[in-house]
Amino acid sequence: MSEDIHEIQARHSEENGKKDYGADDIRVLEGLEAVRLRPGMYIGSTSARGLHHLVYEVVDNSIDEALAGYCTHIEVTLNDDGSCTVTDNGRGIPTGMHETGKPAMEVVLTVLHAGGKFGGDGYPISGGLHGVGISVVNALSEWTRVVVRREGHFHEMRLSRGEVTQYMKTYGETKETGTSVTFKPDIEIFKEGVDFDYDTLKIRMRELAFLNKGLTITLTDLRDGATHEEKFHYAGGITEFVQFLNEGKDLVDPAVIAFEGEKDKVIVDIAMQYQTGYSESMYTFVNDINTIEGGMHLAGFRSALTRVLNEYARKNNILKNNEANLSGDDVREGLTCVISVKVPNPQFEGQTKTKLGNLEVKGIVDNLVSEGLRTYLEEHPAEGKAIVEKGITASRAREAARRARELTRRKNALEVSSLPGKLADCTEKDPKMTEIYIVEGDSAGGSAKSGRDRRYQAILPLRGKTLNVEKARLDRVLNSDAIRTMITAFGTGVGEDFDITKLRYYKIIIMTDADVDGAHIRTLLLTFFYRYMKPLVTEGHVFIAQPPLYQVRKGRQKYYTYDDDEQNKLLDEIGRDGCAIQRYKGLGEMNPEQLWDTTMNPEQRVMLKVELTDAVEADRLFTILMGDKVEPRRKFIEEHAKDVTNLDL
C-alpha cells in the first residue's frame, strides 16, 4: 500500500497501453430520438437541477480523460450569450472513420450511448461515459459547437437540437490536444429558465478538484460584462477536502488521518478527522459520483473502524472487561470522513442508483482501513486515546438518550391520548392527505387554529426557546420541550429510532414571522430536522410558509405582497394615491380569515419546498451558521452581505 494515488493511476495508464483511443473504441448501443421527448429520463428533470446536469455531463467526459491519465486542466466558462464552454487538454474525441461509415466524432455527438467506455479499452475507469452525456447535451441544446484538437489539426462540428448543422471539418494546425464543447441550453426544454447559477457550478467543480488530486479546474463567468474567475487545484486531494469540511470546527487532532491503496484495480482513497462536535459527516464517492445512499465501500469502512477502535480500547485497557463494546454510532460521533473509490465496473443500486453494490469493494476497503488505522493508533497513542474516550462519552450519552426516549414512550402509553396537548390535530387520518403547521407563539397559533381547514390541517404552536441542536448531544436535545413536542406530533421517533413510515403528516410547514427572529427560528428548526430527522428533508416533506409582508387596500380591493420589490411593483401598477398600507410585524397581527387567504389556503398560498441539493455544502453551512466559532460566521456574513436585507448582529 506504499504507492500514492498518482502513482497508481499512472501505472494504470501504462497498463492500459497508453492504449490508442481511436474510432474503433466507440460502441453504438442505441439511438437519440427519445431524449427530447423525455428529457427527464436522461438528466433527471428539466428544472434548474437538470439544466446544471448538462454542464456536469460534459465535464464528466473531461474527468474521464483525467482518470485515464491524459488530462490535467479543465476550463468551464459561462459566456455572455448564455452558452457554456467546457475545454480540456485530454486526447480529444476520436475523429477517424467509424465502422458505421461516419467520423467517430459525429457518432459520439449524435448517438446515445456511443462512447469509449463500452469496449473496455478507451477508459479503464469512468464516471460519465464519454458520448452518453455529450449526445444528450446536444439533443437538449438550441445549438452546440465542438472543436477537437487532435493529430495536429482542429476538427469542428456544429449541431442544433440533436441534428447536425455543420459536418466535421478539419482545418489549421496545432500541437495541442483536447476537446472544447460550447452549448446553449434550449428554452423549449428548460421552460423554467436557462440561466446557469455560478454558485451551484462552483460547488461541484470544487468537489471534483478535491476528488482528483492535482487536477486544475477553472470556472469563469463572463456574463453581465464582467469577468469572475476561480481556480480549484488541490495537491492534497481529499485530505484538503476534509480540512475544508472541518473549517471552523474544534478538532480532536489537527492532522487528517489518510489511507490510500489499490487491489484488483480498485483504487481506494480515504481521509478522516475527528472534531469535538456531535454530528457524523460521511461522504462517499465512486468514480467521482456522490453515492448518497452509501453502499459496500461505506460498509467496509464502518466495520473496520468499529472493530479496530474496540480492539485498541481493550488492548490499552481504556475499555474495561465489564464494559460493553462501543457501537458504530459511538465511534463515528464527531467524525468527518471522505471515501473515494475508483472501480472499473461499478454496480449501482438503490432508489436513486447512488448505492455501490460491488461486494468485493467491502473487503478491499475493510482491509485497507484496518491496516492503516492500526498503524496510526500505534504511532499516535495520545490521539488514539482521545478518539476512544470521545466514543465512550458518546456511548454514555446515547444510553441517556435511549432512557429519555423510553420515558417519553412510557408516558405516551399511559396517557389517554399520546399526542401533545398543544397540538390542534386534524380529522383526516391518511398521512398523505394531511399537513402540520409549526407556528411560533400562542397568538399566531390561535389565529392559525381558527383559520385552518380542520379536516386536513393540524397546528402545533411552539412555546419557549428552540434549542440550537448544533451545539448539543441528543440526550440534551431530548430535554427541550419544543423538540419533544414535535417528535411526538410527527410520530416518527428521532435519531437512530427515526422511522419515516410512521410520519403522521406528509407536509410539515414551518410558519414564522417574516422578520429576523422568525428567520432564526426557521434556521433552528431546519438544523434539527437536518441533523436528527434528515429523511424529512431528503424526501421532500418540509416546507416554509410565505406569509405576506404588506396588505394594500385601495377602494374595496385588498392586495397582499410578499417583499419590498413586489410591493413597489404593485403600487406602480395601481397608483399610490388612495392606498392604505399595513405592514405585518408578525403572524399574530392577522385575523384568521386573512391568515387562511394569504398563507394557508392551498389554492392561493405560496410555499417554499426545502430540498437538499448538496449535502456537503448543507453540512458546512449548518456548522458555520450554528456552530461555536465566530470567525467563520463573520467571514460568511461579509461574503454574502450584499444578498441580505435583514441582518441581526
Predicted feature residues:
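GHKL-family ATPase ATP-binding module
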Residues: M1-G22, L32, Y56, D64-A66, ...
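Short conserved segment of the HATPase_c
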Residues: I93-G115
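C-terminal interaction appendages of subunits in large macromolecular complexes
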Residues: R396-E415, D430-E435, G446, S450-R452, ...
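Conserved short strand/loop->alpha-helix "switch" segment adjacent to the catalytic nucleotide/phosphoryl-transfer site
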Residues: L37-Y56
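Mature N-terminal segment immediately following signal peptide/propeptide cleavage
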Residues: A23-R38
